[in-house]
Structure formats: C-alpha cells, structure tokens
A protein has these predicted regions:
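Conserved beta-loop-beta element that borders a ligand/cofactor-binding pocket
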Residues: 173-201, 222-228
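N-terminal Rossmann NAD(P)H-binding glycine-rich loop of SDR-like oxidoreductase domains
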Residues: 18-36
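C-terminal substrate-binding subdomain of Rossmann-fold SDR/epimerase-dehydratase oxidoreductases
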Residues: 227, 235-237, 243-347
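Amphipathic regulatory helices of Ca2+-sensor modules
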Residues: 366-386, 414-428
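Conserved Rossmann-fold NAD(P)-dependent oxidoreductase catalytic core, especially the SDR/UDP-sugar
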Residues: 91, 116-164, 188
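NAD(P)H-binding glycine-rich loop region in Rossmannoid oxidoreductase-like domains
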Residues: 69-110
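Primarily EF-hand calcium-binding motifs
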Residues: 350-363, 390-415
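Flexible, glycine-rich beta-alpha linker
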Residues: 139-140, 160-164, 185-208
Length: 455
C-alpha cells in the first residue's frame, strides 16, 4: 500500500521540458529530476540524444532530438506535443563565455534568439514557468567582489558586464521579464558560478581551469621541486579567487528553484545566485598536492580567460537562496578534490582494463583489428541503438579512432596515447555519435529515394 501511494504521488508531478538537455548540466538535471519523480522531456539539437541520457532517466524520461532553439517551427511542434500550462521549462541552450567571445553573433542567435523562440512556444501552449541558468559572467567590474546577488543585477541594469556573454545573459533576463508582464509568466533564474563535475564532460569555460588541473594531476610531476616541462599550464592568475559549485550542490539548488512555491520567491525577477565554493588556483593546487605531492604547474595566461577571471566576483551571497529556497552548499574544497580525483582514478582503472582486454598479444600496443574486435564484442552486441544502423558505424568509428590515436601512422596505438584520449572521451559515447551519424545518413538516402525512413 505504501509503495502504491508513493508511486501515485511521484507520477502526479507536472512534466518538465528541458531545452539543451544534452549538455553537462542538462544531463545531470534530467537524471536528478526523474529521480525525484518528475516526468522529463529532454530535447537537444542533435538528431539523436545519447543512449546514456535515456538510461539515466529511465521510464520517466523521453528524449526528443533534432530540436534547435533557432528553429521556431520545430520548437513549436515540440511544445505542442509535450507541454501544457502546467509544464516547467528549462532553457539550457547557450554557449560558454569563451565560445561567445570567439563568435558573438552566433552566440547571440543561440542565447537571445533561442530564448525568444522558447518563450513564444511557451505562450503558444500556455506554459508559465521557465527556469534559466544565468552566470557570474553577468557581473562586471562594478559588481561587489564578495556577497554578489542576483538582486544587484536587477538594481544595476545598465552596468557593463565587460563581455558579449554577459550582455546576452542580461538580454535573456529582460525577455523573461517581458514574458511575465505580457503573459502572466513565472520566470525564474539561477546565477551559476563555475560548475565542477566529476565526469570528463566539460568544455572550454573560464572556471574549468580547475577541472583541467584535476584531470592532469595524476600525470604531472615536478623535478627537484620545480615544475617539469610537461607541468600543468594554468591559464589565469593563480591568486585570483573565483566562485564555483560542485555539480551535486548545483542540482539541489536548481531543483529547489524549480519546485519553490511562487509566493515564497521574494527576490526581484525571482533570481537567485547559487553559491558553492570559492578558491584561488593556488589554494586548489595545495589541495591537489595532498593527493599528488608531485603535481607541478606553470602559469601561461590566456588573455580571454584571465580577463574574465579578474572581472567576476570572488564570492556569491548565501543569504537569499537559503531564505527562499532552503538551499545551501554542502561540498567543501577538500570534498570536491577528493570526489573528482576519485572519479578520475576509477576512469583510469577502467581505461587500463579496457586496454588489457584489447591487447590480446600483451605487447602494450593496439592494432586496428584488436580495437575493432573489442568494439564489436562489448559495445555493440545487444545494443538496439547501435545494431539497427548496421555494422558500418563500427568500421567508421574505428577508422576515426585510428586516425586520432595512431600518432606515428604505423598502424599502432600506444598505451600512453590511448590513456590520454580516454581522459576526455568515452568509447561508448563516441560510438553512439558515429551510430547516430550513420542513421541520419541512411534516413537522408531513403528520403532522396522518395520513401519515408523507418530506421
């Protein structure tokens, strides 16, 4: 009886539609929401979303591919089929700060143009609640260094954030405010610091120097107490403090924002900073050396990353999210470092085991035949999403691997090259991408023949 009543309670929660669900934060949010009983529709612009995302969501999740926020008609169809007035929408489709600096026009089309299209689709079906991830990139040089709040952004609408990235985030907040006025909407936003993951899923954001250092830690050493030639290269001033949040704390904060009673949200525009940790590179490196005493680094400043690092606040306020959302961070710097390094060690162990499985002649090197045999045996057999595309994806995948890993072009992949590649890649995820590409090509060929594809 107890189990039945709990099931009914969980299934009664309104649906959550996530746009941009295949990113690092999106994947974790999908899994966290379904774990709390929310029915989740995960959408992204790629035609086929990762099988790992569907498995993480289970029966409460639905994956919808081929949804680009810049495509008004596709978005409208998505909302007509999967959303109503009770649906909560998350718009996570946006490039990173450094990516925006490199191509502001494209970033604006995705960030602000995408938000405008999402809000139009919401109005079309009567959806009210939208949650948006803002960023510390919205704060400029005039912002307080400590105790920064989302309220400050509201009270200083004309401050210069110092980047196109920050201007575009401000534009999204303005669009949501207009949506609230014109359609009685319930927009909410969370100002995020740098997000720290235990998985190797990050991109090229400014705060991700910390994850790069943690990833490099087991492989960097010093010589006579000085950084070796291959020491980790720190792209920002090692004494600059920046706010961060570990992904477990972040999920708690995002879900608290989504589930909060509208009447309890007292901050302007229902915006809240989600604080976590705050540390300098030097403080991080001290903690890393407790695990790897030989960790070495050299400073080689990246102009864009260092500019942002010096521009943003040192710390975010904890008062408002605790008062209205019941959120406060739990993960310390020591906890975070131990967690991330432990995850890397587990991944390294799995990598070593996979290499040993493939290295059937125990030479410490891999041939193309050995790699393809492993992929077919362990990654394809019994996986419907791979097998239905035919076996062509496997050969193309192995060709791609050999092109990347056979550095000497002698048909051999060394352990060093394979382990380095595996730090940032998953063979299963890479194979999935290749399978999706092959399936898309098959669909296109079938349409060109005048038929409707069924693969």
């Amino acid at each position: 009886e107890c189990g039945f009543s709990v099931t009914i309670f969980l299934m009664s929660k309104p649906a959550t539609l996530i746009v941009g669900a295949a990113g690092a934060v999106g994947k974790r949010l999908c899994a966290a929401l379904t774990a709390r009983g929310h029915r989740v529709i995960a959408s992204d612009r790629m035609d086929k979303l990762p099988g790992s995302l569907q498995r993480a969501m289970g029966d409460l999740g639905t994956c919808v591919g081929g949804v680009d926020v810049c495509d008004v008609e596709t978005l409208r169809t998505l909302f007509e089929e999967h959303a109503d007035e009770n649906t909560t929408v998350w718009n996570l489709a946006a490039p990173l700060s450094v990516e925006t600096a490199l191509d502001p026009a494209v970033a604006e089309a995705v960030t602000m143009g995408g938000m405008r299209n999402v809000l139009q689709a919401m109005a079309h079906v009567g959806a009210r609640r939208i949650c948006f991830t803002d960023s510390i990139g919205s704060f400029g040089a005039a912002a307080p260094r400590c105790g920064a709040t989302a309220r400050w952004l509201h009270e200083n609408p004309n401050q210069d954030p110092g980047s196109d990235y920050g201007l575009q985030k401000r534009g999204c907040r303005e669009l949501m405010a207009t949506f609230a006025e014109e359609h009685g909407g319930d927009p909410r936003f969370a100002v995020l610091p740098g997000v720290l993951h235990s998985e190797a899923v990050w991109g090229n954001g400014t705060t991700e120097y910390a994850l790069d250092a943690l990833l490099a830690a087991p492989h960097q050493q010093t010589t006579l107490g000085l950084p070796a030639q291959d020491a980790y290269l720190c792209p920002i001033d090692p004494d600059v403090r920046m706010p961060m949040v570990f992904v477990d704390d972040l999920m708690n904060g995002l879900i608290a924002l989504q589930e909060a009673d509208e009447q309890l949200l007292t901050e302007p525009e229902q915006g809240y900073c989600l604080p976590g940790l705050s540390f300098t590179p030097n403080e991080l490196f001290v903690e890393i050396r407790k695990h790897y005493p030989g960790f070495g680094f050299r400073v080689e400043l990246d102009d864009n990353m260092n500019k942002f690092a010096n521009l943003w606040p040192d710390e975010l306020s904890e008062e408002e999210p605790l008062r209205d959302l019941g959120y406060s961070p739990n993960v310390t710097l020591a906890d975070m470092v131990s967690n991330v390094l432990g995850a890397h060690e587990n991944r390294n162990m799995l990598t070593a085991n996979a290499f040993k499985e493939m290295d059937t002649d125990h030479t410490g090197e891999l041939t193309r035949v050995e790699m393809e045999k492993h992929v077919r045996k362990y990654l394809v057999r019994g996986r419907e999403e791979y097998s239905r595309t035919g076996q062509g994806a496997v050969s193309k995948f192995v060709d791609k691997l050999m092109n990347e890993l056979d550095t000497n072009k002698d048909g051999i992949v060394s352990w060093g090259t394979f382990s380095e590649w595996s730090r940032r890649h998953s063979m299963e995820e890479e194979l999935w991408r290749q399978a999706a590409t092959v399936e898309d090509q098959l669909r296109k060929q079938i349409r060109e023949l005048g038929h409707e594809p069924v693969v």
